[in-house]
A protein has these predicted regions:
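TOPRIM fold recognition
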Residues: 130-191
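Basic, glycine-enriched DNA-binding surface that flanks or lies within the catalytic cores of DNA
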Residues: 3-97
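Generic alpha-helical secondary structure signal
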Residues: 2, 36-40, 148-151, 174
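Phosphate-handling DNA/RNA-contact segment within nucleic-acid enzymes
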Residues: 62-156
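Terminal peptide-recognition signature
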Residues: 42, 124, 165
Length: 191
């Protein structure tokens, strides 16, 4: 791919190998169903593979003259939240930043859960599946992915009667929690 061609090529093998082009990035990304090897790696992190939704993919991408392998999810702006389980400590965004929304399978619901990143979300799903957590099972899950996305979440959260916050206990996580709780009386901190 030439430097003048500023497109992100997404090759989704599940959709007949058709390529989608997203402007303003020079990366190539290949999506496929989560591989057994990636499921085993997630299990090493304590995540139950049977709890992982189909929206989580095994991903290969090229960047900086290197091919990276990891897992990821798409966000609402078409970007990809990506982590290399062997080489990264936390997920990063490829292309456009945005929240990731996982709506409840029951349709419209009155509660949501907010997570800092998709690895926290996967841990929550694993704990729920194993019966170790008894919070709302039927709720929309929103993954913030980056503190820049806070304003987008604040708008989204106004639609819910109950907002469950699962944010880090870091100083940034505490500021996010306090900001959300000040703006939304329905917010409950579970960190």
């Amino acid at each position: 791919m030439s430097e003048t061609n500023k497109y992100l090529t997404i090759m989704n093998k599940q959709k007949n190998g058709k390529a989608l082009h997203l402007e303003h990035a020079a990366e190539e990304i290949c999506f496929e169903s989560l591989t057994v090897k990636d499921q085993e790696k997630l299990q090493e992190f304590g995540i139950n593979p049977s709890s992982i939704p189909e929206e989580v993919y095994s991903i290969d991408c090229s960047s900086l003259n290197r091919v990276w392998h990891g897992i990821g999810m798409r966000n609402v702006h078409g970007g990809v939240e990506f982590i290399s389980l062997t080489e990264m400590k936390r997920p990063t965004t490829i292309h456009r930043k945005g929240i990731t929304l996982q709506p409840s399978k029951k349709g419209s619901v009155a509660s949501c859960c907010l997570f800092s990143n998709f690895m926290d979300y996967l841990a929550y799903l694993s704990l729920s599946k194993d019966g170790k957590i008894a919070l709302p099972k039927e709720c929309d899950c929103i993954i913030l992915n980056h503190h820049f996305n806070l304003s987008h979440f604040l708008v989204e959260s106004e639609e819910y009667e109950e907002v469950n916050l699962f944010l880090p206990n870091s100083s940034a996580g505490k500021v996010l929690t306090r900001t959300i709780m000040d703006r939304n009386p329905a917010a409950v901190d579970w960190s």
